[in-house]
Amino acid sequence: RNFIGMGAAVYVFDQNLSRLRTLDHHFQGKLVTMVSHEFNLEKVCTFADVLVGAILVPGQRTPVVISREMVKSMRKRSIIIYLSIDHVGCIETSRPTTHSNPTYLEEGILHYCVPNMTGVLGRTATHAMNNACWPYVRLIAAVGLEKALETNPSLERGLYTHQGEIVHPYLRDSLEGRI
């Protein structure tokens, strides 16, 4: 949304056609939606000034979809911003950085890969998190945890521990060294 507001040409990639249609409708054609596959990603890398990585695959290691070769094809001094670096990288040249040393150059491309980027904006992030969580808190308060889990699949998918047990497959697998 911010890039569109600044007049940038924005390309959004996804494998879910329904999600792409929804985005296209929501932004009234002001962005370009494309199916995420190697050919499209290679093509866009050659002219992108800013590449934003934001892939999260719950329960799985994030696949590398932007190879070092694709990064090499980018114009020098382009920028990679990786929003979900704390979930392993979808860009081969990415590695976590810190708020005190947030950027590095690799293949002539400036990388910004700070985990928990919202930590810089603590108050704003807190308000956003409160707003996102409030409907779940109200549901649990109204019907109790067990009934809320039964009636709300997204709440159930977000549950990591329950009654002293690890119930989320991704957390369990990562703690057991399978991820």
Give, region by region, the residue ranges found by the protein language model:
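Hydrophobic/aromatic beta-strand patches that form the interior of the parallel beta-sheet core
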Residues: 11, 34, 79-81, 112
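ADP-ribose/adenylate-binding Rossmann-like module
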Residues: 51-110
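Electropositive phosphate-/nucleotide-binding environments in soluble metabolic enzymes
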Residues: 13, 17, 38, 42, ...
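Short, glycine/charged-enriched secondary-structure capping and boundary segments
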Residues: 3, 25-27, 48, 65-68, ...
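Structural beta-strand/beta-sheet cores of well-ordered domains, especially the beta-sheet scaffolds
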Residues: 6-8, 29, 46-49, 62-64, ...
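Adenosine-phosphate binding glycine-rich loop
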Residues: 85, 90-179
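Glycine-rich phosphate/diphosphate-binding loop of Rossmann-like nucleotide-binding domains
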Residues: 1-56
